[in-house]
Amino acid sequence: MTAPANGPLRIAMISYYLPSGSKIGVGYQVHELATELVRRGHHVDVFSDCPPVDGAIYGHRHIASSGSLRTFRFALALRRVDFGSYDVLHAHGDDYWLWRRRVARHIRTVHGSCFEEALRIPGLREKLRMTLLGFSELLASVVADETVVVSPVTRRWMPWVKRIIPNGVDSLRFHPDATQRANDPTILFVGTWENRKRGKDLAAAFERDVVPLVERARLEMVCRDAPDTPGPGIHILGNLNDAELSAAYQRAWAFCLPSDYEGFGIPYAEAMSSGVPVVSTPNVGARYVTDNGAAGLLTPLGKIGTSLTQLLLDPLERERLREAGLKRAALFDLRTVVDSYELLYRAND
C-alpha cells in the first residue's frame, strides 16, 4: 500500500523515548523530525511512554508501561492501538508485534544495533536484555514495509536493509558564530559521566594531559551524573535547553565524546554543524559521521588527552577540521533528512 501522493499526511510515530523523560538520543531525533514534519503541514502524533514535551507542536499519545521489562510491555501495548486513521506509521523502535496492524505505509528506522550494545554493556542481565532487543530489531525489519538504518555499519546486523537515511541536525539552531567563541581554550562534552559515553575517562585525560600544557583550559560537560567535584578546570553544565546547548557549542574550541559505542552520534553532527572540531574514539558512529576521520580526529582512548592538547595548541589544524566538519555536516541537515522521509512515506512498495 502507499500513502496519498499529494497533500498533508497523517503520521503516527512510535518512540519509547522523548526529551521530556529521557536523555536517549533517539527521543531527541524523534522530537526534531516530528516538529519539522508539522512545520511542513503534516499531522503528527507521537506514541510514547514519556510525557509530552513542553511546547511541542505535534500531538502526543501516552502509552503507559510499568514494572520490569517496560520496553517490552510498551511494545505489547502498542498492539492494542488502532493506527487505521493514519497514512503512515513511522516507528523508531518497539514495532515488532505490529504485523497486520495495517496503515498505508509502515516505516521503521533503526538507530543503531542493540547487538552492538550487548557486546559492550556491563552486567549479564543488561547483556541479555540488549540481545533480546537486538532480535526484536531483526523482527521489526520484516514487519515493516520498509526499514531504514541511520548509518552503513548498522547493516552489519541486517544486511538485507539497503536504505540509509542519517539522523538530522537543525542547522538553523546549530551553526557557527565566531563572536561567541570562548576566550579560554574550551572543550565541550555532551553525554554521561558513566558507562559507554565515558565522560569520566575524558575528565581524567583532561586533568592528566591537557591542564598541565594548555593555560586556562576548560572542559565543559553537559551531563547530569557527574560528581560534585569533577576536577580542576572542569565545569558541569547539567541539563541545557536548546538555546543553551547551541551557545555551548559556539563557545567551544573543540568537541569530544569518547564513547565506546554510538550507533550514529548526533552530538558529533551538532558540533560539526556549529563549526567545532570533533575529537573522538573510533566508534562506529564517529567513523561514519566524520567520514572515517576526514572531518574529525579519531584517536584511541589512551591518547585522547594528548590529541586534545595538540589540537588546542594548533589553530591551523582547528581551522582545517572546522571547514571539513561544516562540509560534512551538510549531509545531516534536518531539512534534507526530512525531504528523504517524505519521499519514502509516499513511495511505492
What residue ranges belong to the model's regions?
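Short alpha-helical donor nucleotide-sugar binding micro-motif in glycosyltransferases
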Residues: L240, A247-A252, Y341
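Active-site proximal beta-strand in glycosyltransferases
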Residues: V88-H90, R100-R120, V148
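Carbohydrate-associated surface elements
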Residues: V153, G168
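Short hydrophobic beta-strand element within catalytic cores of glycosyltransferases
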Residues: P277-S280
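Membrane-proximal helix-turn-helix segments that form the acceptor-binding/catalytic region
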Residues: K127-T147
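Conserved donor-binding/catalytic core segment of Leloir-type glycosyltransferases
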Residues: A178-K197, A203-E207, E220
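Aromatic "clamp/platform" in nucleotide-sugar-dependent glycosyltransferases that forms part
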Residues: D260
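Conserved acidic donor-binding segment of nucleotide-sugar-dependent glycosyltransferases
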Residues: G238-N239, D291-K303, Q310-L316
